[in-house]
Design a protein with these regions (language model features):
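Catalytic core and acceptor-binding pocket of nucleotide-sugar-dependent glycosyltransferases
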Residues: 117-124, 129-282
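Active-site-proximal specificity loops/subdomain of glycosyltransferases
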Residues: 41-102
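Short, well-formed alpha-helical segments that are part of the catalytic scaffolds
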Residues: 17-32
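Short aromatic/hydrophobic "clamp" motif used to bind/position activated sugar donors
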Residues: 108
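N-proximal low-complexity "stem/linker" segments adjacent to membrane-targeting elements
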Residues: 1-21
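Active-site acidic Asp-centered loop
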Residues: 111-112
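Soluble or luminal CAZymes and related metallo-dependent hydrolases
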Residues: 14-21, 87-95, 210-214
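Short loop->beta transition adjacent to catalytic acidic/histidine clusters or analogous donor-positioning motifs
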Residues: 6-8, 30-40, 58
Length: 283
């Protein structure tokens, strides 16, 4: 079955983004994904008020603010004087899941408020990959995601199962499974305040405060299930076997697309694109 632009639900999740008004995101999405259902899911009351006033969304989902955890990493020298970025994993899970649950169509695009698709190329990619066979019996299909921070653990940050969480495109039931990860525990968020780093840790890895990266928590719960032990015990738990097993299994669950291949504008991460192009998986 070939999918078209008018058979999808688009879920935009997150707080207001300062670079541009969300009105322009919706206008562009309506152009390139005509007749699609567009849903806003947020706990940002100022954004919700603004969205209701605009009247451009098909549905608006108000989500309770579950609060933030301590920052994912300890402050480094280069971070001094910069605003502290807290760990928003539980807010992300809740806003994304509640929005996806409201989707009316079987095919769903979930995107952040600070990103936008400039064309509809993701539909062409989906129609290209949707029938590729795999050994995965847990999900209905694969999820298309971005190469932005889909980290290859052979390089400077050796974190397997670190698949980007910034964008998902796939079947509704698969996105529900992805965002049905359990609440991230507080003791995991401050893990390295009381635990010693692995002896092989490098400078990029030993600034982590959290036991796992957000992306690892979502990816491993999605692939292995909520009640199954993870194949890694901490963020940079690494071996040749772990990498081999990871690279064997993840293509059955994800297609990792370079932003250019899906016309993804993610200006917030422009400064990281050299890293993304050299150290992340990609189409």
């Amino acid at each position: 079955m070939e999918y078209s632009m008018n058979k999808i639900s688009i879920v935009i999740a997150g707080p207001a983004y300062r670079e541009f008004d969300i009105y322009y995101s919706i206008k562009l999405l309506r152009t390139h994904f005509p007749e699609s259902e567009i849903i806003l899911s947020s706990n940002d009351h100022l954004l919700l008020t603004h969205a209701n006033r605009l009247g451009v969304f098909d549905k608006i989902v108000t989500v309770e603010n579950s609060g933030e955890l301590p920052s994912l990493k300890f402050e480094s020298v280069s971070d001094r004087g910069q605003p502290i970025v807290c760990n928003n994993i539980n807010k992300q899970i809740k806003t994304s899941l509640h929005g996806i649950l409201e989707a009316s169509h079987d095919l769903v695009l979930k995107i952040r408020t600070d990103q936008i698709l400039m064309q509809n190329h993701i539909i062409s990619l989906w129609n290209l990959i949707k029938d590729i066979p795999n050994d995965n019996k847990k999900t209905k299909g694969r999820i298309i995601t971005s190469s932005i921070f889909s980290i290859n653990p052979r390089f400077s940050e050796r974190m397997p199962y670190h698949i980007s969480d910034m964008l998902q495109f796939g079947f509704k039931e698969d996105l529900i499974r992805y965002y049905s990860a359990p609440e991230y525990p507080f003791d995991y968020s401050v893990w390295y305040e009381t635990h010693i780093y692995a002896s092989h840790s490098n400078r990029n890895e030993n600034i982590f405060r959290s036991r796992y990266a957000v992306e690892q928590w979502l990816t491993m719960n999605y692939i292995f299930g909520v009640n199954t032990p993870f194949p890694i015990k901490y963020h940079n738990d690494i071996s040749h076997k772990i990498i081999k097993d990871f690279e064997y299994i993840f293509p059955d669950f994800f297609i990792i697309a370079h932003p250019k291949d899906i016309s993804l504008r993610a200006s917030k991460f422009n400064s990281a694109m050299n890293y993304v192009n050299n150290q992340c998986y990609s189409t």
